[in-house]
Regions:
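Expand to "…catalyze enediolate/carbanion chemistry for C-C bond making/breaking, isomerization
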Residues: 1-262
Length: 262
């Protein structure tokens, strides 16, 4: 089975630089994935990407060295299994608030004896190899999103679930959970403390700490806090920010448009 290079990056003490694809188009995904990302995550939770679009995007990303990942819309067996069968080499699941929810997610994403995933890989065999079923539990990554006070409270028990590779922080939802405006670079002390605590606890257990950011400056800050899986905004936001700054610069204005939210 094709190896998941993200595991080796982490093993070597490196940081995963992850792209985020929200435009439901295979050509856009292909161009974006050629930027040099370690991985590109297709987002099926927020935005217009459905399974059919995601399938073409997975194929497009596979023309590059980027590892194809997906964020599922919810902790649902059907879509979790379909995306893994389609060749996603990892999944990020939103709103995991309890150990039981994490166990359910892992069960859907792992073949027996670790889980209850049904046998039926289709495109995954073309991408990963005929022995996919033998190595999928070891190569495919599963991340639980921590973005609520409940998830934060239950972090230790969530991280104890066998078969879970790490967590992924949604700073905007986490900020809102603390009664603050949504932002990818929180300034509130409570939210910052929560972000730091999540990384500290996760890394102490030898697991991967992931987080969404608004760009390189915030990503580097999160690296300093212990995060080793870092997303830099998304393709739609990157396109709009870059285009807006091109227009401003051409007009002699300050090219200072930045990504404030997702």
């Amino acid at each position: 089975m094709r190896k998941n290079k993200l595991r080796q990056i982490v093993k070597d003490g490196g940081n995963i630089v992850n792209g985020w694809s929200a435009i439901p188009n295979s050509y856009a995904a292909e161009v974006y994935a050629h930027a040099g990302w370690d991985s590109v995550t297709i987002d099926l939770q927020h935005g217009p990407v459905d399974f059919q679009a995601a399938l073409g995007m997975l194929q497009a990303i596979s023309t590059t060295d980027a590892v194809p990942l997906c964020r599922v819309p919810w902790n649902d067996a059907a879509i979790i299994m379909k995306l893994l069968d389609a060749g996603s080499y990892g999944l990020i699941c939103p709103m995991i608030n309890t150990k039981e929810e994490a166990e359910q997610f892992v069960s859907f994403g792992r073949y027996p004896p670790l889980g209850t995933r049904s046998m039926g890989p289709n495109r995954a065999v073309q991408y990963a190899g005929a022995d996919y079923w033998q190595g999928a539990n070891e190569e495919c990554l599963l991340f639980a999103m921590i973005e609520t006070k409940a998830g934060l409270k239950n972090l230790d028990s969530i991280l104890s679930v066998k078969g879970l590779d790490g967590v992924y922080v949604g700073p905007s939802d986490l900020s809102m959970a603390f009664g603050k405006p949504p932002t990818l670079d929180p300034s509130d002390g409570e939210v910052i403390a929560a972000i730091e605590e999540i990384a500290k606890v996760t890394r102490s257990k030898g697991l991967i700490a992931g987080v969404h950011t608004d760009g390189p400056a915030t990503a580097k800050k999160r690296m300093g806090q212990g995060y080793n899986f870092l997303t830099l905004m998304n393709d739609a936001r990157a396109l709009s920010v870059y285009a807006a700054n091109l227009v401003k610069e051409t007009r002699g204005e300050a090219a200072n448009v930045t990504a404030k939210t997702y």
